[in-house]
From Swiss-Prot:
This is Phenylalanine N-monooxygenase CYP79D16. Its EC number is 1.14.14.40. Pfam families: p450. The lineage of its organism: Eukaryota, Viridiplantae, Streptophyta, Embryophyta, Tracheophyta. Involved in L-phenylalanine-derived cyanogenic glycoside biosynthesis, including prunasin and amygdalin defensive agents. Catalyzes the conversion of L-phenylalanine (Phe) into phenylacetaldoxime (PAOx). Cannot use tyrosine (Tyr), tryptophan (Trp) and valine (Val) as substrates. It comes from Prunus mume (Japanese apricot). Heme binds at residue 472.
Length: 534
């Protein structure tokens, strides 16, 4: 058996090498012709020390031997003392960047040049063949869907229209945590990862479907096992969108699923769409039955009711399904990750809790809960969330940008087709930008003049919500969700390490940037009992 496997592997390798050699030499001739003029004046970004690209495959062998890839890349950049690098994976120049000046040039000055996305089997499957928005290459489909998102779903008017749904879920979150403090066990130990992730999922599902759960909720208001599996599948898709699969750089490997990513994505899609698609299909039938006269109550109604110039549905059923899935993915991870990390850090620095509660009590008092109208006055609370975005980003890199033409960035030549990745870790923890970059210090974000703190970072010293032509169009929603989640948890409860633990272990997971262990913390109500029942 082992001999057969070895023989098949050898045959595959020989076939692959022959295919790649022909493609490589053909592409090299084209690249040499197109790039010759610019390359005479500007070099490629530096190759990290110790890396020498192999013919055809580049540094793919090193990538495959050094997992997780994002930690390998950041280690190479640190050892080479560079804020921009060029790592060739097969015939693709991968360019990680951790300098805010270069990042601003990419996302602001040259955002039109870097306005497309890389192709991968994961993004193809998740977007139903590139018919959505965030992960879709630049083109007419992207323009169409982005217009729908910005003008119909995320406009200021629509944001206000959906306020009650967001507040309902914030109220539900507080009741759920309160129930954990008063359950039969009486322990008050709360799984904050579960609470924060499901709050975010519940908010976006309420906005899209006008419902919290696809299955029955538990007696304490929490999610069922089926609901937890659904949300876990959403997070698994986020983990594998741009996971440095070999097939992302050598297209002929797609379908072989050598690293198992394709199966994981397909399984996640099957699970999530098992819950989402029947709701969407039933709603479409309802609209058809009412002849397009249904009064909209959520974003799904809006998507279905859109018409083109001839009065026909603007979006196909697949476009609606794909966009709904993408909106859910876009909403769940950033706020929940920031809140979990911030509370973990603050448990180890209790004086930060005290300062945040003083602000909350001064603005909100103790006879009601935090409302969205309060958020603009909660500068220290927002500084705590902002610091979590800086120090503990949800992903190591921003969504990759692909250069649509040869260009230069910071006196470096960036060939057409390069994958440019802004490092959230490298920017937010850059010692050339931040004092004590590895310390959680919310006060660094407070302004001397007392002006309002915002979660966005226009100078790209860190990335909370991306900017530019392919930037995050939901930063207002993301800010509301993040600050409301965090403020409700801080205002309603005190938080401590569980009994027999003096501190929270802040170790990162090896393969991602979440806490290595989900945050379990001891919660105690700090408001009058009647406030929790609203």
């Amino acid at each position: 058996m082992e001999a057969n496997v070895g023989f098949l592997t050898l045959c595959l390798a020989i076939t692959l090498v022959r295919f790649l050699m022909k493609r490589y030499w053909h592409q090299s001739k084209i690249n040499d012709k197109n790039n010759k003029a610019i390359k005479q004046h500007y070099p490629l970004p530096p190759t990290p020390k110790g890396l020498r690209p192999w013919p055809i495959v580049g540094n793919l062998p090193e990538m495959l031997m050094n997992k997780p890839t994002f930690r390998w890349i950041h280690k190479l950049m640190e050892e080479s003392n560079t804020q921009i690098a060029c790592i060739r994976l097969a015939n693709v120049h991968v360019t990680p960047v951790s300098c805010p000046i270069l990042s601003r040039e990419i996302l602001k000055k040259q955002d039109a040049t870097f306005a497309t996305r890389p192709l991968s089997i994961s993004t193809f499957l998740i977007t139903k063949g590139y018919i959505t928005t965030v992960m879709v290459p630049f083109g007419e489909q992207w323009k169409k869907m982005r217009k729908v998102i910005t003008s119909e779903l995320l406009s200021p008017m629509r944001h206000k229209w959906l306020t009650d749904k967001r507040i309902e879920e914030a109220d539900h979150l507080v009741r759920y945590v309160f129930n954990q403090c008063n359950n039969d066990e009486g322990s008050g130990i709360v799984d904050l990862r579960l609470a924060t992730q499901h709050y975010c999922a519940n908010v976006i599902k309420r906005m899209i479907f006008n419902q919290r759960y696809f299955t029955e909720e538990m007696k304490d208001g929490g999610p069922s096992v089926e609901e937890q599996n659904y949300v876990n599948a959403v997070f698994d898709m986020l983990r594998y969108i741009y996971a440095f699969s070999a097939s992302d750089y050598i297209s002929c490997l797609r379908g072989l699923d050598l690293d198992g990513h394709e199966k994981i994505i397909k399984d996640c899609i099957k699970l999530t769409r098992k819950r989402q698609d029947p709701v969407i299909e039933e709603r479409i039938r309802e609209h058809q039955k009412l002849g397009g006269n249904k009064v909209p109550v959520d974003l799904l109604d809006i998507l279905i009711s859109l018409k083109d110039a001839s009065g026909q549905p603007l979006l196909s059923t697949d476009e609606i399904k794909g966009q709904v899935n993408e909106m859910i993915m876009a909403a769940v991870d950033n706020p929940s990750n920031a809140a979990e990390w911030a509370i973990a850090e603050m448990i180890n620095q209790p004086h930060l809790f005290e300062k945040a509660r003083q602000e909350l009590d001064a603005v909100v008092g103790k006879e009601r809960q935090v409302q969205e109208s309060d958020l603009s006055q909660l500068n220290f609370v927002k500084a705590c969330a902002r610091e979590a975005f800086r120090l503990h980003p949800v992903a190591p890199f921003n969504v990759p940008h692909v250069s649509m033409a040869d260009t230069t960035v910071g006196d470096y030549f960036i060939p057409k087709g390069s994958h440019v990745m802004l490092s959230r870790i490298g920017l937010g923890r850059n010692p050339k930008i931040w004092d004590e970059p590895l310390k959680y210090k919310p006060e660094r974000h407070l302004k001397d003049d007392g002006s309002g703190v915002v979660l966005t970072e226009s100078e790209l010293r860190f990335i909370s919500f991306s900017t530019g032509m392919r930037g995050c169009v939901a930063s207002t929603l993301g800010t509301s969700m993040t600050v409301m989640l965090f403020a409700r948890l801080l205002h309603g409860f005190t938080w401590e390490a569980p009994p027999n633990e003096s501190r929270i272990d802040l170790t990162e997971a090896d393969g991602e940037l979440l806490l290595a262990k989900p945050l379990f913390a001891l919660a105690k109500p700090r408001l009058p009992a009647h406030v929790y029942q609203t």
